[in-house]
Design a protein with these regions (language model features):
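Hydrophobic alpha-helical membrane context
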Residues: 14-15, 94
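Sec/Tat signal peptide C-region and signal peptidase I cleavage site
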Residues: 16-20
Length: 177
């Protein structure tokens, strides 16, 4: 009887460990094809879930009243002014290349955009949030990715409006347009 109980606990432990390993795999890794995909000028390069029927809101409205849009699924459009150079897991999106931007992260790190996405037009659907980034994270983002933050708090943290995209579409801007 003792052996059966010990064996049962052993199997239970193995199954728990196996399930924990599966949970760790939820974050995908960017492939070379993800990183180097060409962004078309006559159609959209689509990543993540298809764009749905979320309310379209201008980035200027989101940035002016972030609390109004926090937690809501919306569609935003703009130009990518900067993006992750390691995997393509985030981008900064602005209405124009010289306007204030919002950081767009790809939901659950499950899809990626090309590393050379800066300058492309983008449509992204997802959820707006207001977050405080820790000093270590801010320092890392500045050092590794050249991120820019307008208002850094005295303790080195940053409060920022961010956007978690469930889907994103990219289109190259034709020269002269």
């Amino acid at each position: 009887m003792k052996k059966i109980i010990v064996f049962t606990f052993f199997l239970l432990g193995l199954s728990t460990a196996a399930l924990a390993q599966e949970g760790m795999k939820s974050m995908a890794e960017a492939t070379e094809a993800d990183k180097t995909a060409a962004i078309p000028s006559d159609s959209y390069l689509k990543r993540g879930a298809p764009i749905g029927k979320a309310e379209k809101v201008s980035l200027s409205k989101v940035l002016a009243e972030p609390a109004k849009y926090a937690g809501r699924t919306v569609l935003v459009e703009g130009v990518i002014v900067r993006s992750c150079k390691m995997e393509g897991c985030w981008a900064e999106l602005a209405e124009t290349k010289d306007s204030k931007s919002v950081r767009v992260k790809m939901k659950d790190h499950a899809f990626f955009i090309p590393l050379q996405s800066a300058g492309a037009m983008a449509r992204a659907e997802g959820v707006v949030s207001v977050k405080t980034l820790g000093k270590a994270q801010v320092d890392h983002m500045i050092a590794e990715d050249g991120a820019k933050f307008e208002n850094r708090n005295a303790d080195g943290t940053v409060s920022e409006v961010s956007f978690e995209a469930t889907g994103i579409e990219l289109k190259s801007i034709k020269p002269g347009s």
